[in-house]
Amino acid sequence: MALRHTISPQFSNRHSPPVTRSVSRTGVHQPLDTSTPVTRRDSQPGTITGTIQRFHESADDSEIDLNSSKFIYKEHFSYKEITSMKKEMWYDWLEYRIRMVRRRFVPTWAQFKRTLMAVVLFAMLYKYARDCLFDGTHHNSEGSYADKDANWASEKQKFHQTISNLRAEFSAHDKQLDFKTDHLEKLLENVLEHSKGWKESAIEELKQIKLWQAEISDALQQMKKEIDDAKSTKIIHSTPEKAPETAPTASLPPSSQLQPMHITRRALLGVNVANSLIGASIDHSCSSRPVSAKDGFFYDFMSYFGTFQEGYALLDRDVLSPGEAWCTYDKRATLTVKLARFVIPKSVSYQHVRWSGIVPNHAPKLYDVVACTDSCCTKWQPLVANCEYKERDGSYDEQEQFCSVPTIQNHSPINHVQFRFRENHGDMPKTCAYLIRVYGEPVDPPKETQPMTDNGTESKLESAIVNSVSETA
């Protein structure tokens, strides 16, 4: 029988057998085999022909099954191809088995749902059967629970005893609180009763004080009248007696007499109400901007942050030190002063630092004084005009020089004045005022501007004291 070899020398992994040709062992082509494959059905009587069998009919009339692996391996593949195909068949067989196992043992979603429902149904049946079975044994367990409760009876008794003790303590505390509250209520009632009595006594004392105040005011008015009468009588009797004694002073110029808008020598006409010691102050919002009394760029620059020296212009003192003054660079310098009391003005004065012979530079030379009728002196009334501060020829250097205010019968009381400096000595750009004074007779403030006090007696008493001081002066 001739051998069959593949046309290609390479191994073939195809499932269908390759095309072959008959070759002899010596390499000579053999004639085509006359055997032909025949396909036939098993046609035995009584059998079902469900399969088709293929047979190979050789020349010697022997039949070989074409479906057998032996025929395929022997007739169509070489030895090497057969061994390689066997190896591949082993791997294919293993893969096939794994797939079969997965198909059989790995459930699908439908199988999983059916299994889950079966498990849940089984669990429900088990629970129902267990409840039915162990229902009778529940009473026995209650007996065991009673035995366990008996063991904890002593501890329960202790717990209840502690609770009862706490309740007793709370009740005792409540009783103490009630007792203390009752005691405090009684004390409060007693205090209220005493306070009512104290209020009544205080009201009576206030009434007595008001009566005393009225008596004191009447007495003061009588004393004022007596003093005025005494002054008038003294002046009448003293003028003819002192006429010859005043002969040496006849050489004084007529400007030295006490007349309006003229300089006087020394005249104390009332109380200085422009004194910071009794409450007077500078109204900076309506005054010129203050600067340092010292000259220099540094002091001018620091004056923007405050000089702290301008208050000396209202500090009534005997000795004036250099530098303790209110100064400004304004050409029309204005100094607004809030007086300590409402007064009827009689005179004003100015005093510079100690000088001799010549008035120092920066000192005011010519100034006016007006009475402010509103808060910032936009409305005003003239008091003194053209008041001059200067040296005297051949006479004593007066450090404080006065200017009297003309007397007006219906002059209203004032508490704001403004000094308007028009000229200074030396024609310097800076004007410095060391000490200004405003003399007058303190009076009661107007009714529309009278401040309310605690008991209505403070302002009257203060005014009475100031009046008495002015009269004694």
Swiss-Prot record:
Q: Which gene encodes it?
A: sun-1
In the UniProt entry, what is the domain comment?
A: The SUN domain may play a role in nuclear anchoring.
Report what the protein is called. Answer: Sun domain-containing protein 1
Query: Is-annotated flag, keyword Disulfide bond?
Result: no
InterPro entries (alphabetical) = SUN1-5 (IPR045119), SUN_dom (IPR012919)
Which stretches are transmembrane? 262-282
Q: Keyword RNA-binding on this protein?
A: no
Q: Please give the GO cellular component terms listed in this UniProt entry.
A: meiotic nuclear membrane microtubule tethering complex; nuclear envelope; nuclear membrane
Task: Map out region (Disordered) in residue numbers.
Answer: 1-47, 237-257, 443-473
Q: Where is the composition biased (Polar residues)?
A: 7-47, 248-257
- Residues annotated as coiled-coil are 163-191, 204-235
Localization per record: Nucleus membrane; Nucleus envelope
Q: Which UniProt keywords apply?
A: Coiled coil, Membrane, Nucleus, Transmembrane, Transmembrane helix
Alphabetically, the GO molecular function entries are: protein-membrane adaptor activity
Pfam (any one)? Sad1_UNC
Its job: Involved in centrosome attachment to the nucleus. Required for zyg-12 localization to the nuclear envelope. Together with pot-1, it is required to anchor telomeres to the nuclear envelope in embryos.
User: What top-level branch of life does the organism fall under?
Assistant: Eukaryota
Q: Report the residue ranges that make up the SUN domain in this protein.
A: 279-443
